[in-house]
Amino acid sequence: MTISGEVEEKLRKFIRESSFATAGGVVTDLDGTAVHEFQGRIAIPKEVELGLMRHYERGRPLMLNSLRFPLSVIRTFGQDWYKLSNAPIPTVTLNGSLMGFVKKSPEDELEFEEAAAFPLTESEIVAALDGVRGLLDGGIKNVLVFYYPRDWRIGEVIWTPVPENIDHVKEKYRSASAVTAVEFPKLQDQMLAEDICMIFLLVDAPEDQLMAYQHTARSNFVTHKGVDKLFGARVMADHLQCDLRDSLGAGDTELDNFLAGVGLALLVGNNQLNFRGLADTIKLNNSQELGALLFRAAELAAEKATHG
């Protein structure tokens, strides 16, 4: 697949006028952008693989930036991605709150090495759970609390207020390491006893039931104040000593706000996003087009590095 003339022109201009070839990198969201689910399996499209390989060959940083938790990244496509990188993978997880490197252990197993973490404060955890308490007091029991400890080995823990629902929740959310239905006060005590990087509140109830509790969104990601994907990208870019202003960024949802912090923003898919790159913005229809653009960007960067 080749890129269109208009995309080629924008890409050439960005690489010509920026320091992408020497100081930039690539930041990409995962689900819906660089990876897709196919027949129940998460896969990296071939075009994306080829584009990624060209960037890895050049040796410039390539950062993953995802809502997923580290254990999920490792379990779903970590092996496939590591075959492309053949080196530790810079990874921003949990909406910017936990970042580090997916790497091989001495036993040749994939593991996560933390570089930085920004867990919720006790007051932030209590505030999130106060919203849940309000729903429970109002008779709404279709509430799930997903929480993600800083210790990446724990993975994803889900709490339901209905013990009879544990098996159903386990079946529906197979990524969870544990599903619990402890009493609400004990849940709060457990969460306050450890570093929690992100909480996800999921409410499955009719709109009319929720009217009195508008402070609790139907679905709500909770991280430490000021922490999001853009924040995480900036912290990791500093760690990698690359400049986001000279980088490409690819995403597909409104949570991918790092797109507003990169030089060239690549908006993938059909969602109408308002993000604009600092230098320019390119709209792509799918991940196949993203792969073709990444491949071409690596070619142009290599040409600039060789010929100036």
Residue ranges and their predicted role:
Residues A34-G40, A217-F221:
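Glycine-rich phosphate-binding "P-loop"
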Residues K46-V162:
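Active-site phosphate-binding/coordination module
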